Amino acid sequence: MTIIIDGKKIANDLCERLSQKIDILKREYNIFPCLKVILIGSNPASQVYVRNKQKKAESIGISSETIVLPNNILEDELIEKINELNEDPSVHGILVQLPLPNHISASRVINTVSVEKDVDGFHDENVGKLVKGEKNCLIPCTPKGSLHLIKSIEENLSGKNAVVIGRSNIVGKPMFYLLLQENCTVTILHSQSKDLAEYCSKADIVVAAVGKPNFVQADWIKKGAIVIDVGINSVNVGKLVGDVDFEGIKGKAKAMTPVPGGVGPMTIAFLMMNTVIAACLQKGVDASDFIS
């Protein structure tokens, strides 16, 4: 019987424990974690994501503010705003909601955010630290949350064969390095890969992040595998499905995540955790309790 991994419950449990640690930071260290989110324009999906992040932050004791800027803002004006937040010692985390308008360079914006305040973990320096396996860095939230879900089923991943489908900088590539650090043998597949089914059929762990509904078929998955579905796709007038054939794989996999209610809540939980880690690092407080 397949275990359906309840990402919402696991995320809520994490945030409850994090809230207790935030209370300690406030009481004993006079640290009041603060997250600033920059939203460009009025993309409905982005508005929902940002609202969910702010709601969760406030519920666990993180001060949060969303700064809404017009869609036609100049790139240099946005950079100036980010630099203001970089220089504000009361701000510990800065998140610029993606995607950005076409006239703005995402790379320049991401790398303008201070390395220590980069709670998305997208800054080139944080990416480099992840690749090197350093622990005291900010790691992208979705891969970090996905790994936590995998380890909720199986703690020791050493020697496991893992397949990551998708090579984005946000999910696929950092997921590859996180699994590598767990001593997995990792294969990353993408749009130009051949024989995807063959690779997946040998995998103990499959992480799907391609943005294509029901892309991963049941006959690709070996019995007893752990399947993490990062995708969230809208089909049939608002119905949400993931990147894997949930009904087909259920009963075959050892464990799998649903969509919604799997990886999504974990992404927000680890954004909260990254904000607290960032506050600790900036204030010289040992953040080891939050980095595991």
UniProtKB/Swiss-Prot annotation:
NCBIfam families the UniProt entry points to: PRK10792.1 (NF008058), PRK14187.1 (NF010784), PRK14188.1 (NF010785)
Q: In which pathway does it act?
A: One-carbon metabolism; tetrahydrofolate interconversion
Q: Which SUPFAM superfamilies does the annotation name?
A: Aminoacid dehydrogenase-like, N-terminal domain, NAD(P)-binding Rossmann-fold domains
> Subunit composition?
Homodimer.
Q: Name one Pfam family in it.
A: THF_DHG_CYH_C
What reaction gets catalysed by this protein? (6R)-5,10-methylene-5,6,7,8-tetrahydrofolate + NADP(+) = (6R)-5,10-methenyltetrahydrofolate + NADPH; (6R)-5,10-methenyltetrahydrofolate + H2O = (6R)-10-formyltetrahydrofolate + H(+)
Gene Ontology terms describing biological process: L-histidine biosynthetic process; methionine biosynthetic process; purine nucleotide biosynthetic process; tetrahydrofolate interconversion
Which family, according to the similarity comment? Belongs to the tetrahydrofolate dehydrogenase/cyclohydrolase family.
Keywords of the record, alphabetical order, are: Amino-acid biosynthesis, Histidine biosynthesis, Hydrolase, Methionine biosynthesis, Multifunctional enzyme, NADP, One-carbon metabolism, Oxidoreductase, Purine biosynthesis
Q: Where does NADP(+) bind?
A: G166, R167, S168, S191, I232
GO CC annotation terms, alphabetical? cytosol
Extent of the signal sequence? none
EC number from the UniProt entry: 1.5.1.5, 3.5.4.9
In its UniProt entry, what is this protein called? Bifunctional protein FolD
What's the stated role of this polypeptide?
A: Catalyzes the oxidation of 5,10-methylenetetrahydrofolate to 5,10-methenyltetrahydrofolate and then the hydrolysis of 5,10-methenyltetrahydrofolate to 10-formyltetrahydrofolate.
Q: What Gene3D superfamilies is this protein classified in?
A: Leucine Dehydrogenase, chain A, domain 1, NAD(P)-binding Rossmann-like Domain
